[in-house]
């Protein structure tokens, strides 16, 4: 699939339903393989409330910042950062919503297009990512993107996760500027 059919943009109100559908209509086993503790999931309305809040906040105020991924102008996934320390660092997440679009290398291309938004708008010096160590796809993507593997350890990486082994990856602004995406 050519990169000409791929684009990215900041989240809009029209994205809240399909993004929520991804989380609330996905197979529970898929979510567990990603490291989600289903008992920690907020309600759909609470989830939508968090997304709506993000839309009304300045970059400096955001607790999460989401970029929507489009294939032929249709939303097919997203990436967001959270655990944001504005002007310093944030933690990256990446999600392709439909299983038909997974394992095609789209995530790699989309993240390359997304990273400038995070570095520029959040004024970041470093982006970290801590995928579930037993989920190979995002770990392979981080390596291919030029993120540096720092360590593997056990933690609860997010508010909807169970305790799990994660791989901690980092990409500094300096290294990002050197990469020729």
Identify what each model region corresponds to.
Residues 1-18, 28-29, 66-181:
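Acyl-donor (CoA/ACP) binding surface of acyl/acetyltransferases
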Residues 35-36, 63, 158:
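Sparse recognition of residues in long alpha-helices and their boundaries
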């Amino acid at each position: 699939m050519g990169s000409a059919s791929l684009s990215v943009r900041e989240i809009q109100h029209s994205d809240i339903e399909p993004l929520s559908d991804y989380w609330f209509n996905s197979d529970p086993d898929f979510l567990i393989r990603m490291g989600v503790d289903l008992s920690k999931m907020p309600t759909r309305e609470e989830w939508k409330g968090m997304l709506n809040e993000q839309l009304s906040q300045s970059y400096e105020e955001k607790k999460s910042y989401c970029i929507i991924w489009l294939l032929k102008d249709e939303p097919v996934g997203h990436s967001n950062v959270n655990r944001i320390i504005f002007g310093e660092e944030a933690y990256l997440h990446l999600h392709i919503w439909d299983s038909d679009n997974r394992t095609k290398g789209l995530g790699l291309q989309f993240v390359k297009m997304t990273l400038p938004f995070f570095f520029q708008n959040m004024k970041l010096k470093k982006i970290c990512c801590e995928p579930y160590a037993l989920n190979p796809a995002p770990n392979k993507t981080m390596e291919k993107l030029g993120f540096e593997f720092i360590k593997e350890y056990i933690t609860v990486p997010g508010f909807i996760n169970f305790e799990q082994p994660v791989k901690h990856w980092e990409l500094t602004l300096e290294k990002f500027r050197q990469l020729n995406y």
